[in-house]
Structure formats: C-alpha cells, structure tokens
Design a protein with these regions (language model features):
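PLP-dependent aminotransferase class I/II
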Residues: 1-143
Length: 143
C-alpha cells in the first residue's frame, strides 16, 4: 500500500510529458559519447542492443582499476565530475555476506566494481560541454 501526497501527482503531471523527449536526448548524448570515444582502446563502453535501447540515466565506462582514481582526479582538475555508482559488487555487500550468509565469488562483478566510472550525462548537456569532456578523456589516455 502506497499513499501519495498531493504534491507528487502535481510534479509527475509536469515531468511525465517530458519523459520521452528527455530519454531521447540522453540516448543522443550516449550515442555521441560512443562516437567521440570510439577510437580509445583504454576504455570499455557497454554494448548497445538495437532491440533494447538504454535510457542512459548513467553513462558508464570501464578503465583499468590501477588508473581509475588518477583518471577521475585528472578529470576533476578540469572541472569534470564523475561518479562511481556501483563501488561494491552485490557479492561483497554486508547484507549478502553477513545477514543473508551467502558466500559467493563473482569475479567479473567484483572486477567491474573496481573499474567503472560514470561520465556526466543529463539532457541539458551541450555538445560543447561533451566535446570538452571527451577532449580531456582522450588527452588523458594519449599522455
């Protein structure tokens, strides 16, 4: 049972009509990231599937774990914020190991949690801002 106050429907009545346009814009930004960063062997981007396009609430790349912190520090020095939205794999969360008493080893998930970096992505991100971000990513890996 969920009860909504009157403010939530008012907010949704404004936001929902914009959902498709905002999602389309994020998809366009993600496609542009893919194009601009496609020649970099030093990063991995997630696969894109034609029959199931992402909504790109995040745009996550993977870099080697040994350079991730330095890479993020470099981008921050250029005014580019990044995130690590999934820093711990499910198999290593305390709820999994301590409370559920599940002992499982998921090497790929654990590796991914050490390599992921989320780049800025939001519908208002301009081409100029995205060019700036990508130029600095490329510069970092060409040094």
């Amino acid at each position: 049972n969920s009860r909504m106050d009157t403010l939530q429907p008012a907010i949704l009545s404004v936001k929902l009509p914009q959902l498709v346009a905002r999602t389309t814009k994020r998809q366009s930004i993600a496609a542009r990231y893919r194009t601009l960063l496609s020649n970099l062997d030093s990063i991995q981007m997630s696969r894109e599937y034609a029959d199931s396009p992402g909504v790109y609430h995040l745009f996550v790349i993977r870099v080697e774990k040994d350079i991730r912190d330095d890479f993020r520090t470099y981008l921050k020095s250029k005014g580019i914020e990044t995130g690590i939205h999934y820093p711990i794999s499910l198999s290593r969360l305390k709820v999994t190991t301590d409370q559920l008493k599940i002992d499982v080893h998921c090497p790929e998930a654990e590796k991914a949690s050490e390599e992921v970096v989320s780049l800025p992505i939001y519908p208002e991100l301009t081409d100029q801002q995205q060019d700036y971000i990508c130029e600095h990513i490329i510069t970092y890996f060409q040094k």
